[in-house]
Structures are given as structure tokens and as C-alpha cells.
Amino acid sequence: MTKVLYITAHPHDDTQSYSMAVGKAFIETYKQVHPDHEVIHLDLYKEYIPEIDVDVFSGWGKLRSGKSFEELSDEEKAKVGRMNELCEQFISADKYVFVTPMWNFSFPPVLKAYIDAVAVAGKTFKYTEQGPVGLLTDKKALHIQARGGFYSEGPAAEMEMGHRYLSVIMQFFGVPSFEGLFVEGHAAVPEKAEEIKANAIARAKDLAHTF
């Protein structure tokens, strides 16, 4: 069975967020088109997503030195264990849908913490004599991102770092197909905000048939 990991990184729901509204339209249509696929919603603002900190480094160091997982402290086990769970869940999925806003030219920090949890050598990529090689070569990914301004082209395109970062990390993981669906300009042209949102929702529903 095809497994889709629907990853949202926004504190608001679809009634307050443009990206979440478009994401909801996409995933609901996707479920209708693919009723036999398993869709798992991972809300990064509601789930426990550990950050790499002193406990994580300490736990990793102990494991590398040959100690067992049970020999870690309670804090180390909780954090390292959860990161392992997130990584295994990520690897087990066939498709990824990331839904984020653009905040200060990037995305919310909780998504970076999540990426740090799943970027594991030997799991999502490996090191070789020729350099790192991605291991997720049979996956595909989509990024739905809301941007208040216009960043798809022109000088401002160089300032957008959220989608570009995800593109780089997906390539690093070996994911061969990575698409972007952008809702942009609603803050720059507020009188057209509803039209911009409606057009993005329509595109999302269309994309759900082919993703």
C-alpha cells in the first residue's frame, strides 16, 4: 500500500492559514482519488520533535562508543528514541507533502528540527568514496508554501530559502521528484487575496490527481 506522509508546519489551521487551506484541499482531494492509499498527518506543532541538543549528542556518543540504548539516561533515551521513530516513519513513506508558510524567507524552525531528525547517515543517505549518496530513490515529494509577497521570479527569488532548502535536502536524500505549489502575493495585493487563494486551491486539487 502506498503511504503518504502529510507534514504540516504551521501553528494555525486551514481557517487562518493560506498554506494550510491549500494543503487541506490537496490532501482531501488526494484521498478521494486514491482511497486505497494510507495518509498519515504529521503536525509538527502538535508532535514531539526533539531538537539536537546536549542530550542528543551525549546519547549518540554513547551509542557510537558501544553502549546499548538501555544504558542511556532517561532524557537521552526519550530524545534519541523519538528521533529514531521519526526517521523510520519517514523512510517507510512513499510520498511526502510538506505544508509551510514562508517566515522571514524560510520556514518555521520546527521543520528544520524535523529534517535534522530524519537526515541520518545509513538511513536517508550514505557516505561513499565519491561523496554522499541519497538512499530514498523511489520517493516523491511536494512542498505547498504560502508567501505574502512574490518570490517565484525576479530579484526576490534569491531571497526565498525555504523551498530551495527543501529542494536541496530532497536531492541529498536521493528523492528524484520534488514539486512546489506556491500561494503568493496575498499580502502584497490584499484586494486579490481571495482570488489568489482560490486559484491555488484549484491548482492543488488538479495536482492531487497526478501526484
From Swiss-Prot:
Function: Quinone reductase that provides resistance to thiol-specific stress caused by electrophilic quinones. Also exhibits azoreductase activity. Catalyzes the reductive cleavage of the azo bond in aromatic azo compounds to the corresponding amines.
Source species: Geobacillus kaustophilus (strain HTA426)
Keyword Metal-binding in annotation: no
Binding positions for FMN per the UniProt entry: 17-19, 102-105
UniProt subunit comment: Homodimer.
A GO MF label: electron transfer activity
Domain of life: Bacteria
Protein name listed in UniProt: FMN-dependent NADH:quinone oxidoreductase
This enzyme's EC code(s): 1.6.5.-, 1.7.1.17
NCBIfam families registered for this protein in UniProt: PRK13556.1
Cofactor note: Binds 1 FMN per subunit.
Keyword tags: Flavoprotein, FMN, NAD, Oxidoreductase
Pfam families for this protein: Flavodoxin_2
InterPro entries (UniProt xref): Flavodoxin_fold, Flavoprotein-like_sf, FMN-dep_NADH:Q_OxRdtase_AzoR1, NADH:quinone_OxRdtase_FMN_depd
Catalytic reaction equation(s): 2 a quinone + NADH + H(+) = 2 a 1,4-benzosemiquinone + NAD(+); N,N-dimethyl-1,4-phenylenediamine + anthranilate + 2 NAD(+) = 2-(4-dimethylaminophenyl)diazenylbenzoate + 2 NADH + 2 H(+)
Cofactor: FMN
Family according to the record: Belongs to the azoreductase type 1 family.
